[in-house]
Amino acid sequence: MKIIGINGSPRKKSNTRFLLEKALGECGKSGAKTKIYDAMKVLDDQEVPFCEHCSSPCNSSCYEGKKLEKMFEELKQSDAIILASPVYFGTVSAQLKAIWDMSRAVRTEHALVGKIGAAISVGASTYGGQETTIRALHDMLLVQGMTIVGNGLKGIDVGHHGVAAREEVFEYEPAIEDAKNIGKRVLDSVCHS
């Protein structure tokens, strides 16, 4: 079982990455192989770090032999994907959006259809756009044909759309628990799909 996380935060010590690590840590406890891709690093060898819609259908030549191609290959082989983004003006980071925009060839192949997807979002304040960002993350997953799960767990809490936290999360137990719960939910959904 393989579960991939994509960290959309451009920051080095990122609240978003921290919660993604917590979620994937829960998956790893049960033996799942996990990996995090940082959007900034994935895009750093791209000549043009966004989709120019240079071909239709997408021939993926813009990322051939690049880090993005490797990441897309791993996504295709994964059982689940957790997208995580900080809030930027009520939506996902430009880096994460750029990566997903360049996934047109993956979509054409139907490579992610039926895979489990989940979302994590961190904003600067309690009502800082986390839910609209999660909605955007869900839309990104749905356009690929993925099955979305929230952070609810049987017998604990029915949960919500995903993990919606505010900075600083490093010692904020409710956010950490939500992240762990979404990891458990992703794992449970993969095992029972």
Model segments located where?
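Short, glycine-/small-residue-rich phosphate/pyrophosphate-handling segment
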Residues: 94, 108-157
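N-terminal beta1-alpha1-beta2 submodule of the flavodoxin-like/Rossmannoid cofactor-binding fold
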Residues: 1-109, 154-193
